[in-house]
Amino acid sequence: MKIQIKTKEESRNAINRLGLNTVPEIFIEKHETDKMRQFMDTYKEELYVLRDADRSSSHYEYISSYEECVEKAKHFKGRVILAVSINTYKEKLLLGAIEIKGDVVRLCATENKALDHRTMYGGAEYNFETDIFDKNLSKIPELDFLYGYIVEHQLFDITVEFTIYDKCVGTKNERIIINEIRNY
């Protein structure tokens, strides 16, 4: 499957179109406080994340209340993404990004619960490129589960940013969250 993704919104739309499991989130204008309240009333969690909807690797804020959301949103320039934070779900087993292109596997992943998708690149235990026949891949916890998910959903030739948990979570109530798919 050849998917072209240039933005976070295109990634989110593709994730939804492909029926992948993700966290609840909305793309809104920073002044749409009624939509913020409705989202937080619908998805009552301990922790949310607010981030720029139009720029990757941009500033983000963790928030825990509607009032805090409204206040922090004022500091963003335009559209924002309000999402349930993946940190709400406890017991991450493996977090990372993987791309399988032909026989080539590119993987950056960690079991370190202190790392996230932005900080893992500097401290991930698994950060390499190899082929799918490399026997060392079988030593990585949950990689068989991840590979099965990629095959089931035909997520080849694209980077898949994921988090795997010890229990079912997210919009589809599965053990894996797909945080982003990208080729930008």
Each model region followed by its residue ranges:
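Nucleotide/phosphate-binding sheet-loop regions of phosphoryl- and nucleotidyl-transfer enzymes
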Residues: 1-184
